[in-house]
């Protein structure tokens, strides 16, 4: 019981540390973010189970600090940790049930596994390492294909087990594997590398991805009439990439569970 209480206390310490870290990040005070990371690491706030989280946070902070080599180093560590933590053990799941999800080894969300490759590609672009950046966009495409298979497989399984018949489990119009961001970056990178035919192919895939994406969001279709300019790197000097908003915010819900293990017959046998 003491160990459970201690693990629970640590989870709240980590939550507080994350709040401070993200506040400094929101204020664009990346130097302070770096200092906080080092302090939290020294205090062992990021335990072994939190290494994916630590590496993702580090990768983002160093990216926006223009320390691209350091950023890619931490993103690579995060990607390796995610691969290693793919399978969760039953014992960790039981531990999380008794305390909270912070007991689990954090293996990242699918979107985090994808975006780390996007930011690695962006890290290589200022260094003009187009081939290395293309490796990362190809990794994004591969992961999206695998995620598409996984999600559609889950939808099919749920459809078979759904006895109510009220939910719509059809996935015919959903193409998760078609990433507009990956095709956008690939179009630019192939053009920069002088591979104009592949740049054209990626630009066409980008237009298709945006049309498909419009069926999943309330936003109107993007105007793709000017996208051909992406295939002509000599006609532009500055690439603007903006990321707004934040990921879905997870809120912990505490619940008390009463387990009545009293057995009247065994009690009588005892006496």
List the predicted regions and their residue ranges.
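Bacterial Sec signal peptide processing site at the extreme N-terminus
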Residues: 9-29
């Amino acid at each position: 019981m003491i160990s459970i209480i201690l693990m629970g206390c640590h989870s709240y310490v980590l939550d507080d540390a994350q709040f401070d870290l993200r506040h400094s990040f929101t204020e664009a005070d990346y130097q302070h973010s770096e200092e906080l990371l080092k302090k939290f690491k020294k205090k062992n706030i990021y335990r072994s189970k939190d290494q994916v989280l630590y590496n993702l946070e580090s990768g983002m902070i160093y990216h926006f600090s223009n320390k691209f080599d350091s950023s890619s180093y931490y993103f690579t560590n995060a990607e390796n940790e995610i691969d290693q933590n793919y399978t969760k053990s039953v014992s960790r799941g039981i531990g999380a049930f008794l305390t909270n999800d912070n007991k689990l080894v954090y293996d990242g969300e699918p979107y985090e596994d994808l975006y780390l490759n996007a930011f690695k590609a962006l890290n290589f672009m200022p260094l003009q390492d187009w081939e290395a950046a293309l490796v990362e966009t190809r990794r994004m495409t591969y992961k999206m294909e695998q995620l598409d298979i996984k999600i559609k497989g889950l939808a099919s399984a749920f459809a078979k087990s759904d006895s109510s018949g009220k939910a719509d489990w059809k996935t015919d119009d959903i193409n998760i594997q078609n990433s507009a961001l990956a095709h956008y970056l690939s179009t630019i990178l192939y053009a920069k590398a002088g591979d104009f035919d592949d740049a054209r192919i990626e630009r066409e895939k980008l237009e298709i991805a945006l049309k498909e994406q419009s069926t999943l969001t309330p936003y109107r279709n993007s105007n793709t009439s000017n996208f051909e300019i992406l295939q002509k790197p000599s006609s532009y000097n500055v690439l603007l990439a903006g990321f707004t908003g934040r990921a879905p915010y997870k809120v912990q819900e505490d619940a008390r569970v009463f387990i009545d293990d009293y057995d009247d017959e065994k009690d009588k046998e005892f006496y």
